[in-house]
């Protein structure tokens, strides 16, 4: 069953980039709107944020259903999200800026939503690199701390999305609200866990 779920995840996550490749290869850029370059960037970024959001939602669902063995599926989703983020950044650098790195730095400094997006990208990159079993073992407890930053990367990604579209849309606000709820739930869970440990420690001393 776990193998079947993995296949479903990979097929679904491959869908967006496969569709985009088909559109570009077919030459039918009319499906990308009036500004294909902007649409490609937004499509890739939206796909990354969607997959990341699904990853955290499924994590909560698996926890509530008491199916911890399914949590390993989140790793594949996380790596796919990072893959789309890399494509999103590359599309911006290549298609929008023409590989002009000095302009990239200038844009990064002058545009707040790019700074927020860059921080989220950095967090996701570190998480992706640390998904290697060897590094996970070497990092010990720091691996857990690093991956807790994923919740903040999700929120930063949602803020980046809302800010970059410039106009308030239903999808951008929905993603922002869901991201805030997921982060708050994670922080509440950590608070309860630490409170429980503190209570146990005091009880042991008594």
From Swiss-Prot:
The keyword Cell membrane applies. It is a multi-pass membrane protein. Binds 1 FMN per subunit. GO terms for molecular function: electron transfer activity; FMN binding; heme binding; metal ion binding; oxidoreductase activity, acting on diphenols and related substances as donors. GO terms for biological process: protein repair. It is found in: Cell inner membrane. The chain crosses the membrane at residues 7-27, 43-63, 77-97, 112-132, 142-162, 172-192. It holds the Pfam family Ferric_reduct. Belongs to the MsrQ family. Heterodimer of a catalytic subunit (MsrP) and a heme-binding subunit (MsrQ). HAMAP family: MsrQ. Part of the MsrPQ system that repairs oxidized periplasmic proteins containing methionine sulfoxide residues (Met-O), using respiratory chain electrons. Thus protects these proteins from oxidative-stress damage caused by reactive species of oxygen and chlorine generated by the host defense mechanisms. MsrPQ is essential for the maintenance of envelope integrity under bleach stress, rescuing a wide series of structurally unrelated periplasmic proteins from methionine oxidation. This is Protein-methionine-sulfoxide reductase heme-binding subunit MsrQ. It comes from Pasteurella multocida (strain Pm70). The gene is msrQ.
């Amino acid at each position: 069953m776990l193998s079947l779920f993995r296949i479903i995840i990979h097929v679904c996550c491959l869908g967006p980039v496969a569709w985009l490749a088909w559109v570009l290869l077919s030459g039918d850029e009319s499906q990308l709107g009036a500004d294909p370059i902007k649409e490609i960037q937004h499509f890739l970024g939206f796909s990354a944020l969607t997959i990341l959001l699904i990853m955290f939602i499924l994590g909560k669902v698996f926890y509530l259903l008491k199916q911890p063995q399914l949590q390993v599926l989140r790793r594949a989703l996380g790596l796919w999200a990072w893959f789309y983020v890399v494509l999103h950044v590359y599309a911006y650098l290549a298609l929008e800026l023409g590989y002009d790195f000095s302009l990239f730095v200038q844009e990064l400094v002058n545009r707040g939503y790019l700074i927020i997006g860059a921080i989220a990208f950095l967090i996701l990159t570190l998480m992706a690199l640390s998904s290697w079993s060897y590094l996970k073992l070497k990092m010990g407890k720091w691996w857990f701390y690093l991956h807790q930053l994923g919740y903040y990367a999700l929120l930063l990604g949602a803020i980046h999305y809302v800010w970059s579209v410039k106009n308030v849309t239903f999808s951008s606000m929905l993603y922002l609200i869901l991201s805030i709820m997921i982060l708050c739930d994670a922080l509440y869970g950590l608070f309860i866990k630490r409170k429980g440990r503190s209570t146990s420690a005091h009880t042991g001393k008594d």
